Amino acid sequence: VCGTLMARSKAISGGPVYLSDAPGDFIKENIFPLIDKQGKLFRPEAPAVPMPESILTNPLWSGKAYRVAAPSGNGAMTLICYNLNVSPRHQQVQATIKKEDYSLRNSFEKMSATPEERVLLYNWKSQKAEELSDSSTFELIGFTDKLFHLCPIRKGWAVIGVQEKYLSPSTVQTISLTENRLVLNVLCTGTLKVWIENSGKQELRSISIDTPQKIVIEK
């Protein structure tokens, strides 16, 4: 895996990952976020595809951000925004994520989303979350990428997943969900991130997972 940008691209692609470097050159910080303890890849529910505005663009010369997305677990959609421009004039580009982007889950087989569904926008690197009521705009400086998860907010819960893995939503399975209780099957160790709304308050809760297990979370 060549760098963090390539590692995240491999994660969202849904394809195999080949470690072609010499073993002494492996960077575990880029590899471990792709896999569980047994080396099994966390994969999206379908391979990533370019967002509509990126399909017919040349990401090296467009002067714009290049965006790709894939459906991940628990109704979430994982999205990566890239600045792949090689021209010095476009070392800084602007990217926008809109709530309507989440509705593109409809285009994936057996996936569905409704326009009125509330969506949480989670920035994987900064570990910050906010409800995406309209849109969020940010800068991409240099040859770089930013990884986001768009997670549905249902009954005051949004399941993000294990932070240490690129495809966080793919690391958990929702067993049941009510207004006050959430039951999850967590597939790997790490820090589980869950968005919780209760009595008008919002909380991004971090839960330490020492072993893969079924857990019950109360508001």
Where are these regions (language model features)?
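Active-site-proximal substrate-binding groove within the catalytic cores of carbohydrate-active enzymes
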Residues: V1-W157
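Short, ordered beta-strand-loop transition motifs
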Residues: W61, A70-G75, I175-R181, S208-T211
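Short edge beta-strand/loop segments characteristic of extracellular beta-sandwich folds
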Residues: I80-L84, V183-L187, W195-E197
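Short proline/glycine-enriched turn/loop motifs at strand-loop junctions of beta-rich domains
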Residues: A113-E117, L187-L192, N198-Q202
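C-terminal beta-strand-rich structural cap/linker in extracellular carbohydrate-active enzymes
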Residues: E131-Q173, L192-V194, E203-K219
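C-terminal low-complexity, glycine/proline- and small-hydrophobic-enriched intrinsically disordered tails
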Residues: P169-L187
